[in-house]
Amino acid sequence: MKVSELFMPTLKETPSDAEIESHKLMLRSGFMRQLSSGIYVYLPLGYRVLRKIENIVREEMDRSGAQEVHMSALMPKELWEESGRWAVFGPEMFRIKDRNEREYCLGPTHEEAFTYIVRNEISSYRDLPKILYQIQTKFRDERRPRFGVMRCREFTMKDAYSFDIDENGLDISYQKMYDAYVRIFKRCGLDVKIVEADTGAMGGASSHEFMVPSSVGEAEIAYCKACGYAANLEKAECLDEPVENKEEPKEKQEVYTPNVRTIEELVSFLGIDSTRFVKTMIYKADDKFVAVLVRGDREVNETKLKNLLKATDLELASAEDVEKITGAKVGFAGPIGLSIDVYADNEVKYLKNFVVGANKTDYHIKNVNLSDFKVTKFTDLRNITQDDLCPKCRSQKVTIERGIEVGHIFKLGTKYTQAFNCVYTDEKGEKKLMIMGCYGIGINRTAAAIIEQMHDEDGIIWPITVAPYEVIIVPVNVKDENQKKIAFEIYENLQRNGVEVLIDDRDERAGVKFKDADLIGIPFRVTVGKKISEGKLEIRNRRTKESFEVEIEKAIEVVINLIREEKAKYQI
């Protein structure tokens, strides 16, 4: 492809609304443009990258024995009502009506559609197991689209679904997908951490996320450098470590704390360490209110709480509801005398003479002990921190960092097959529910995550496996007929050898061409300049920034070998 003919509208300046590097660089490099909030158009270079990622995904899914299908993005309400998720999925689902007032949704995910098809088409154990997948557009009405394609309203996803006769079969399918994902992200050049995850609204027994460590990631992950344990913050278990506390209970004391509501304000006002406080948080779980107690320096893990209560919806109670329940304004809630269930984090068991809200505006109570109130249940209800030991090996404190989720796999069990009565007949003639797994990869997000991991001050550094082109030929002066002739000879020869190659034949300064080549991230640049008079040209590696000269007649062989060696680094 000639750059003079390529639709590549690069930008010198970074758009003001782009917050993170991947968003900035995808716009500056002419890879995409925004059509509306959270909706993007992919231009030729960007679309080539997405197609390459899709092809890697497709190859590894096929290699694992999965079969590709294509579902409709438009799904009827009745399908989602059958699973019970029409109301549960919430405002993120795009819902529409046709001219006859029939309701549909634009698919945010496709469990319902796949289960429906399999239920209708497979009835015998002889036809199982099956793993079906698609690479499809998904739609989610994000409240606040941000970070470019990291959180957008329309995106491409590979979603796969396995159907097995039993849990052992699911384990095999799950491992196949796990291994395929490892290969996919290796081939895409991504450094990923595989972490235990909560199953969330997807349901099911167990789950893993494939996370790309990044400061701009929306999720936090905890991992152990000693044993390799890794989990996202929602899932990471906090050890119940008994603490010997020989303090004698003291007499309770009500303290006037005017307009002092937060732990930070209380620490300053009372001169007491935050570990001596117990926070009382009032939540609404579906239609029920509960109180949750955690130590003053801890944060409630709402996922753990939601799972404990088996709640569909969980949110902090409104200020009005807090006042009705406690008799006090927000900031002064405490566990003493509450008429609702009180759940406490395990750490609270070992505290004595702590401070709580008095359920009286502008007052707290010092020297409170467990005997002063009733706890419905003690359990793990807090977020893990870097001061906590690894829950697996217990030998080292965990490390916590942010990450970008690029893949997620679930053991769904019978959540959807039961709802759809998706059964098979076994060898004894008995009908049994199929066991499901589901497996997703965000294609657009994978591209953005690659950029987040691989860029510098000059632009993107694409791994050769997903780069839009492998080589760019740059004749320094296209008005020099000799330079132009040699550049095009190399270009055409590389094309004949199956190399994906650009030639920058624009009548531009060499500096402009070099900057664009670096910006769009082409792995190798071949510069045809004045040195051709000596029979030489220059080859530059975008990733290492190393340059070297080669003889013109050896250039094709050298470039092909460089590409072969570079590709080998991403094979598994």
Swiss-Prot record:
Compartment annotation: Cytoplasm
GO molecular function, one term: transferase activity
Example of a GO biological process term: prolyl-tRNA aminoacylation
Gene3D superfamilies: Anticodon-binding domain, Bira Bifunctional Protein, Domain 2, YbaK/aminoacyl-tRNA synthetase-associated domain
Entry GO CC: cytosol
Catalysed reactions listed for this entry: tRNA(Pro) + L-proline + ATP = L-prolyl-tRNA(Pro) + AMP + diphosphate
Primary localisation category: cytoplasm
Keyword Nucleus: no
Entry keyword Aminoacyl-tRNA synthetase: yes
Main enzyme class: ligase
Pfam families with a match to the protein in the record: HGTP_anticodon, tRNA-synt_2b, tRNA_edit
Superkingdom of origin organism: Bacteria
EC number: 6.1.1.15
Keywords of the record: Aminoacyl-tRNA synthetase, ATP-binding, Cytoplasm, Ligase, Nucleotide-binding, Protein biosynthesis
Domain notes for this protein: Consists of three domains: the N-terminal catalytic domain, the editing domain and the C-terminal anticodon-binding domain.
Sequence similarity: Belongs to the class-II aminoacyl-tRNA synthetase family. ProS type 1 subfamily.
Function (record text): Catalyzes the attachment of proline to tRNA(Pro) in a two-step reaction: proline is first activated by ATP to form Pro-AMP and then transferred to the acceptor end of tRNA(Pro). As ProRS can inadvertently accommodate and process non-cognate amino acids such as alanine and cysteine, to avoid such errors it has two additional distinct editing activities against alanine. One activity is designated as 'pretransfer' editing and involves the tRNA(Pro)-independent hydrolysis of activated Ala-AMP.
Summary of subunit composition and partner proteins: Homodimer.
HAMAP family reported for this sequence: Pro_tRNA_synth_type1
Protein name according to UniProt: Proline--tRNA ligase
Source species: Caldicellulosiruptor bescii (strain ATCC BAA-1888 / DSM 6725 / KCTC 15123 / Z-1320)
